[in-house]
């Protein structure tokens, strides 16, 4: 038993020892000895007998021998054993399976990592991690230095920088990006019109020309530039550009500050319009309105003064009589035959006579005649008279001189035969009697006042009244008699049982105790009163009166509820005592006690129910009156609501449109304003103000209470509700500050400009401002023949059927004429050029001799040039045999008069420097890497195009294969001969190959000198540079071989 206990203790100790991890660096170990009883083996000696062969014949040659041998035996003994013991190293203590370091001082903000050594949390330091990092350090033991800039705070734990407002970056070294500001650069800048934003506070630094908190406003009129501090110098109504200060002059003014009127002959915006005035009229420099000279009128002073007027603006009236003609300039009269005098007012004949010798009497009615013509005797009638002898009045509908003027009177009015004045019929007024009398007036000239009452309408002719329903009488003051109703009281009432009939619609208002449309039904049993809404409260009764509710007591009963046998007011023996109950209470016939009516209490029913109760015996509690100044009514229990509330419990707000006590008053709020249900005060919808919200916001303001100022420009109106700008025609944008985009104009920029030929379009009206040489509403027409220039207002001066350029006015002369105005006869040689403007210095004979001489010299020069060219080609061929160049073609050919098709990067390696195209072309094509599917040769190109404009290659060429051929190449190597494909093809200017020449055996390109050379257009001299010169590609060389 002792042995077993000892073994268990040892086993437990061993287990405890083995619990620590020996691999743990904090676990130390040492060897310890212990004694163990063991069974040990040893060598035990013994005498071993064995036999050997010998010569002892007796023992059959076998002899016995002895030797000491050993065998393994076992015995008990004590053995000293050693074992490794694990324990925590010094400075550590054991905790479970681990060895934990031990710190004498507790690590406040950290952990103990080795004996008496703390590892602090980030942001803390000191031996026991109890000290926080200063503002310049962070991390464990505050060992890291903060990198934050610009006043940023450093996180003592992570070292992250908490940037001040306006900065960003991991070290807060950068300002906020444009367009942001504030803490963390999270706030967007509100600045507009290109203004910069302070990265810290977001304050806007406005660009020149803008102002306001957010730079949303242009400089006020009269200022411009940075901070709107510069004063505008513009005069005469000129507006100043809010940024530059440049003056935009109003029409009629020009100059840097708009101080100068338009020069004579011009007017309008920028003085760009020519005055259209004729006959010496002067043009207003602002409007262009013509101020005509005496005798002329009209927009352009093209019209003479009309008959009967003269002078400036034709404002003076001629005073010529008897048909005399008035000079439109001076007003002098030119008399008809038979009259004389400054105003032709004197007859040559005496009054009453006419004819030759003034012997014939006038046939006219003297009273109605102005005069008798002294020659013909024709009568000139007074206004309002007509006929040959002026004895007939004007026919109906005409008046005035000769009864020629039609009357304009309306609605049956009379027209005065002389003046045409209208005499209006009753009920109408106005100059031509076109206006009916205003409400409340009638009669001639609407001078009488209507006397209709109670909404009756008055006839504008005679003032008779048309009464509304329910009224009658001449002035609608009499209501319909009892039993009638309706228009003119023509309807009869059908109400029964004394019910009243509405004089307007005939509806019946029943008396108490009756029901039905015509009040023909009595109240149902158990009900009484108005609309039968009350319930009978009787005990010993046969119902109650349907009108008053009085109980009809059965025989032997009396009292209000028929619950008393004594007569009302009596009780006691023989009902001898008078009841003293008040407020309708009844007394008991036995003891005279009062039974109070509903709503009353007390011995004599002299008091009303206490607050909060009502009804019989004041036993019913009042309902919860939500919005009431006092409890319910002591009799009915109905809640008496405060102003603004309704319903049985006063818990309902007045319906929309009503307010006040019992919601009986009608709200007066207009324009969607909301009405307070208590006092009827109006809370206005945005855009309206006033006691009843009937006043719109004044111009320039909007929103609730018209608090906000409008920001619209260029005459735009501002919505009083939300401040939205309604732009005037020609403007767009949120604040109507942007003109319509090009090609658009008008309202909302929704109309498309129709201007043609480069004309500019007014962004407001869409009116086209034509360029020089064009006219028409949309500038679609050239100037008419004979005119040119701006507005087609200049007249051409070309002569002899020549044509005039509609823009410049240049004359294009007909054959046989010359000169600036084509007014000079041209000589024969000049007829070849109809546009010449220089007269020859020689006569016709000298021209002929000179022409012949020139032609001969030209032919001689051509022969010499051809000879030199042939000699040059021969020398080139001879040199070519010696040099034997390798020619590499990358053609982009265009050969006229052919049908071949070539394109692509075509190369050839030939030792010959010449070949005949028409004969060897097929062989060349066979040996070439070109195919018809990769090369194109267009025969439709212009055969006279210059080599300076190479065609666009349709082949895909290597980068080094294109050489622009602008001039012949002068080099040591000869030209490559490229003859025509056919004898008919003499012009090969269109052949544009890119030719590269690489000298055999040379490692560099041949140098060349480039001369400026442009092939002439529209002309060609056969044999002159018919062959393209060979030109080495400037990009070709050894390096190019490496690339390929």
From Swiss-Prot:
Glycans are attached at residues 270, 531. Pfam families: EGF_laminin, EGF_PEAR1L, EGF_Teneurin, hEGF. Residues 1-19 form the signal peptide. GO terms for cellular component: basolateral plasma membrane. The chain crosses the membrane at residues 849-869. Gene3D superfamilies: Laminin (2.10.25.10), Tie2 ligand-binding domain superfamily (2.170.300.10). It is a single-pass type I membrane protein. Keywords: Cell membrane, Disulfide bond, EGF-like domain, Glycoprotein, Membrane, Repeat, Signal, Transmembrane, Transmembrane helix. InterPro entries: EGF-like_CS (IPR013032), EGF-like_dom (IPR000742), EGF_PEAR1L-like (IPR057138), EMI_domain (IPR011489), LE_dom (IPR002049), MEGF_diff_regulators (IPR052485). GO terms for biological process: homotypic cell-cell adhesion; retina layer formation. PROSITE patterns: EGF_1, EGF_2, EGF_3, EMI. Residues 95-130, 143-173, 181-216, 224-259, 267-302, 310-345, 399-434, 442-477, 490-520, 571-606, 659-694, 707-737, 750-780, 788-823 form the EGF-like domain. Its main location: membrane. Residues 1033-1044 have a biased composition (Polar residues). Residues 1023-1044 are annotated as: Disordered. It is found in: Cell membrane; Basolateral cell membrane. Disulfide bonds join 28-89, 54-63, 88-99, 103-118, 120-129, 146-154, 148-161, 163-172, 185-197, 191-204, 206-215, 228-240, 234-247, 249-258, 271-283, 277-290, 292-301, 314-326, 320-333, 335-344, 403-415, 409-422, 424-433, 446-458, 452-465, 467-476, 493-501, 495-508, 510-519, 575-587, 581-594, 596-605, 663-675, 669-682, 684-693, 710-718, 712-725, 727-736, 753-761, 755-768, 770-779, 792-804, 798-811, 813-822. Residues 870-1044 are cytoplasmic. Residues 20-848 are extracellular. Belongs to the MEGF family. May regulate the mosaic spacing of specific neuron subtypes in the retina through homotypic retinal neuron repulsion. Mosaics provide a mechanism to distribute each cell type evenly across the retina, ensuring that all parts of the visual field have access to a full set of processing elements. Homomer. Does not interact with MEGF10. This is Multiple epidermal growth factor-like domains protein 11. It comes from Homo sapiens (Human). The lineage of its organism: Eukaryota, Metazoa, Chordata, Craniata, Vertebrata. The gene is MEGF11.
């Amino acid at each position: 038993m002792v042995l077993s206990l000892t073994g268990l203790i040892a086993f437990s100790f061993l287990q405890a020892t083995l619990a620590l991890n020996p691999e743990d660096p904090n676990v130390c170990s040492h060897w310890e000895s212990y004694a163990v009883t063991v069974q040990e083996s040893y060598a035990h000696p013994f005498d071993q007998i064995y036999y050997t062969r010998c010569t002892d014949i007796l023992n059959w040659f076998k002899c016995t021998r002895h030797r000491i041998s050993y065998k393994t035996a076992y015995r008990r003994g004590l053995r000293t054993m050693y074992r490794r013991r694990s324990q925590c190293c010094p400075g550590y203590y054991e905790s479970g399976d681990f060895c934990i370091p031990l710190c004498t001082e507790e690590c406040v903000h950290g952990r103990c990592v080795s004996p008496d050594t703390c590892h602090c949390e980030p942001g803390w330091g000191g031996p026991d991690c109890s000290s926080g990092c200063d503002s310049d350090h962070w991390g464990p033991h505050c060992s890291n230095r903060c990198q934050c800039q610009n006043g940023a705070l450093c996180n003592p734990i992570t070292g992250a920088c908490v940037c001040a407002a306006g900065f960003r970056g991991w070290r807060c070294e950068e300002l906020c990006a444009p367009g942001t500001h504030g803490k963390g650069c999270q706030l967007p800048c509100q600045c507009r019109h290109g203004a910069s934003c302070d990265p810290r506070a977001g304050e806007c630094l406005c660009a020149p020309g803008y102002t306001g908190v957010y730079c949303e406003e242009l400089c006020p009129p009269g200022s411009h530039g940075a901070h709107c501090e510069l004063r505008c110098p513009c005069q005469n109504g000129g507006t100043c550009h809010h940024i530059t200060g440049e003056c935009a002059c109003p029409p009629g003014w020009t100059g840097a500050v708009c101080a100068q009127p338009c020069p004579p002959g011009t007017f309008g915006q920028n003085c760009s319009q020519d005055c259209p005035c004729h006959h010496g009229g002067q043009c207003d420099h602002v409007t262009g309105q013509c101020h005509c000279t005496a005798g002329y009128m009209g927009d352009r002073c093209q019209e003479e003064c009309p008959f009967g007027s003269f002078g400036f603006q034709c404002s003076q009236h001629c005073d010529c009589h008897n048909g005399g003609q008035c000079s439109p300039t001076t007003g002098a009269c030119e008399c008809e035959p038979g009259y004389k005098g400054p105003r032709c007012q004197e007859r040559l004949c005496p009054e009453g006579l006419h004819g030759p010798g003034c012997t014939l009497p006038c046939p006219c009615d003297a009273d109605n005649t102005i005069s008798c013509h002294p020659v013909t005797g024709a009568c000139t009638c007074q206004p309002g008279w007509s006929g040959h002898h002026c004895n007939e009045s004007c026919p109906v509908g005409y008046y005035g001189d000769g009864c020629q003027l039609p009357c304009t009177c309306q609605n049956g009015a009379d027209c005065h035969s002389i003046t045409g004045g209208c005499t209006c019929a009753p009920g109408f007024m106005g100059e031509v009697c076109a206006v009916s009398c205003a409400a409340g007036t009638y009669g001639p000239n609407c001078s009488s006042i209507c006397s209709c009452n109670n909404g009756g309408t008055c006839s504008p002719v005679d003032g008779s009244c048309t009464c509304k329903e329910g009224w009658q009488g001449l002035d609608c003051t009499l209501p319909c008699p009892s039993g009638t109703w309706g228009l003119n009281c023509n309807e009869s009432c059908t109400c029964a049982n004394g019910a009243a009939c509405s004089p307007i619609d005939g509806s019946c208002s029943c008396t108490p105790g009756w029901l039905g449309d015509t009040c023909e039904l009595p109240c149902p049993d158990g009900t009484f009163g108005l609309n039968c809404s009350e319930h009978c409260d009787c005990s010993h009764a046969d119902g109650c009166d349907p009108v008053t509710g009085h109980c009809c007591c059965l025989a032997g009963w009396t009292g209000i509820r028929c619950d008393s046998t004594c007569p009302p007011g009596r009780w006691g023996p023989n009902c001898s005592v008078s009841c003293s109950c008040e407020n309708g209470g009844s007394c008991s016939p036995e003891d005279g006690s009062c039974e109070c009516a509903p709503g009353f209490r007390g011995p004599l029913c002299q008091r009303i129910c206490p607050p909060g109760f009502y009804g019989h015996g004041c036993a019913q509690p009042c309902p919860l009156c939500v919005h009431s100044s006092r409890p319910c009514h002591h009799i009915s229990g109905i809640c008496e609501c405060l102003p603004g509330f309704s319903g049985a419990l006063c818990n309902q707000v007045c319906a929309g449109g009503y307010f006040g006590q019992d919601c009986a008053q009608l709200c007066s709020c207009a324009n969607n304003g909301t009405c307070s249900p208590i006092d009827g005060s109006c809370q206005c919808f945005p855009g309206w103000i006033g006691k009843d919200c009937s006043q719109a916001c004044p111009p320039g303001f909007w929103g609730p209470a018209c608090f906000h100022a409008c920001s619209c420009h260029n005459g735009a109106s501002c919505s009083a509700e939300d401040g939205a700008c309604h732009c005037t025609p020609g403007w767009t944008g949120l604040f109507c500050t942007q003109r319509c985009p090009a090609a658009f104009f008008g309202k909302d920029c929704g109309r498309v400009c129709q201007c043609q030929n480069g004309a500019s379009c007014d962004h407001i009206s869409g009116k086209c401002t034509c360029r020089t040489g064009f006219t028409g509403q949309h500038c679609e027409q050239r100037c008419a023949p004979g005119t040119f220039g701006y507005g087609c207002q200049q007249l051409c001066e070309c002569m002899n059927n020549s044509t005039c350029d509609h823009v410049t006015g240049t004359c294009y002369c007909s054959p046989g004429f010359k000169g600036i105005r084509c007014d000079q006869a041209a000589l024969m040689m000049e007829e070849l050029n109809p546009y010449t403007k220089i007269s020859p210095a020689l006569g016709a004979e000298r021209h002929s001799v000179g022409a012949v001489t020139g032609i001969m010299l030209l032919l001689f020069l051509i022969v010499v040039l051809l000879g030199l060219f042939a000699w040059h080609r021969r020398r080139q061929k001879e040199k070519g045999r010696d040099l034997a160049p390798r020619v590499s073609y990358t053609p982009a050919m265009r050969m006229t008069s052919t049908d071949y098709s070539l394109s692509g990067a075509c190369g050839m390696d030939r030792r010959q420097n010449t070949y005949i195209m028409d004969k060897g072309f097929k062989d060349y094509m066979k040996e070439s890497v070109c195919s018809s599917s990769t090369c194109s040769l267009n025969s439709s190109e212009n055969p006279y195009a210059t080599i300076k404009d190479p065609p666009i290659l349709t082949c895909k060429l290597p980068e080094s294969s294109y050489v622009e051929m602008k001039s012949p190449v002068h080099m040591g190597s000869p030209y490559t001969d490229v003859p025509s494909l056919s004898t008919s093809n003499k012009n090969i200017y269109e052949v544009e190959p890119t030719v590269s020449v690489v000298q055999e055996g040379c490692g560099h390109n041949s140098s060349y000198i480039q001369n400026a050379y442009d092939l002439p257009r529209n002309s060609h001299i056969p044999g002159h540079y018919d062959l393209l010169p060979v030109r080495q590609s400037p990009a070709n060389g050894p390096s190019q071989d490496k690339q390929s």
